[in-house]
Amino acid sequence: MNKKYSVLIVDDETEILTMLSRFLNRSGSYDVTTYSNPISALDAFSRQEFDLVLLDIMMPQMNGLEVLEKVMEKNSEQKVVMMTAYSTLDKVLKSHKEGATNYVMKPFDSLQAFERKILEVLKS
């Protein structure tokens, strides 16, 4: 039996959460937990370990870089992929400096390419 990867997805756009959750769950290789509220997501992160965190950068209440900082304080080895519609170099560099493993651009070119990228991160 193959290992199921536990994935936490944090994005304020419910359409993104639904799309990614359905896509990843369909493969049977992932156990997906989603949150549209970053504060609730941090609470879940404090109670459960995840193989991967997919984290939107632009969110109300607390932006993704602030969430990333809290995640890395708890687990400096956590694999995190930042999701952004903004490819500004400063945000990408800051997320890497804060400990993000990688980033992806929204909208996604294809969900299959997106999955390849997260599998690459999970297996690194």
Feature-to-residue mapping (PLM):
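Receiver (REC) domain active-site loop signature in two-component systems and cognate sites
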Residues: 59
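Acidic catalytic/metal-coordinating carboxylates
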Residues: 36-37, 63-66
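Acidic, metal-coordinating helix/loop segments flanking the phosphotransfer/catalytic sites
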Residues: 34-52
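Alpha4 helix (beta4-alpha4-beta5 surface) of REC/receiver domains from two-component response regulators
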Residues: 66, 87-104
